[in-house]
């Protein structure tokens, strides 16, 4: 890949940051608002998105709790942020298993903020913006190891999706010419 292509791919992850638990709306959001908020956080990443029907299915399957008076809470938003990322590499059954594990050890706020920290730690590394990745604590439990593995897998999938999107854009802009220039 050319240097310009690599720069455009890396741009997907530059300055990426998720809102922390306390920064998520404290008032309930309707389904469309919930989907819009989650998708806005991952706008630069093709494939990391939710639809209203997906969210409704997660509720029906019991992966997240039912909305209260048709409004989704901060805890449900946090769960949906994680689902948006992990659904690209895990089955719903495995996502639900990880949710159950984290609930045994951490509050929703702790688990979500740790997820944010890990994603923000791994993305720059996978996208080539940083040469190291912060190590897990020696006493990290199984749930943290599984989360790290999920995030590294998802970050690699996010990288590939960005790379293919850049390649398709370049081919659309310069059909046939790129091959001649190579």
Annotate the PLM regions.
Residues 1-103:
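Basic helix-turn-helix/winged-helix DNA-binding cores
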Residues 101, 105-182:
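Intrinsically disordered, low-complexity, charge-dense segments enriched in Lys/Arg
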């Amino acid at each position: 890949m050319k240097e310009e292509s690599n720069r455009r791919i890396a741009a997907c992850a530059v300055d990426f940051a998720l809102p922390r638990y306390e920064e998520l709306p404290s008032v309930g959001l309707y389904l469309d608002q919930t989907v819009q908020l989650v998708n806005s956080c991952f706008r630069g990443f093709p494939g990391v998105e939710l639809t209203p029907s997906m969210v409704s299915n997660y509720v029906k399957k019991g992966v997240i709790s039912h909305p209260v008076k048709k409004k989704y809470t901060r805890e449900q938003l946090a769960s949906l942020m994680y689902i948006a990322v992990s659904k690209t590499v895990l089955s719903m059954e495995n996502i639900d298993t990880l949710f159950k594990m984290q609930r045994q050890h951490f509050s929703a706020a702790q688990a979500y903020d740790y997820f944010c920290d890990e994603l923000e730690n791994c993305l720059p590394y996978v996208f080539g913006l940083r040469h190291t990745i912060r190590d897990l604590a020696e006493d990290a439990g199984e749930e943290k190891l599984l989360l790290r593995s999920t995030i590294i897998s998802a970050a690699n999938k996010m990288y590939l999706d960005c790379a293919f999107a850049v390649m398709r854009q370049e081919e659309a802009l310069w059909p046939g010419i790129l091959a001649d220039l190579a």
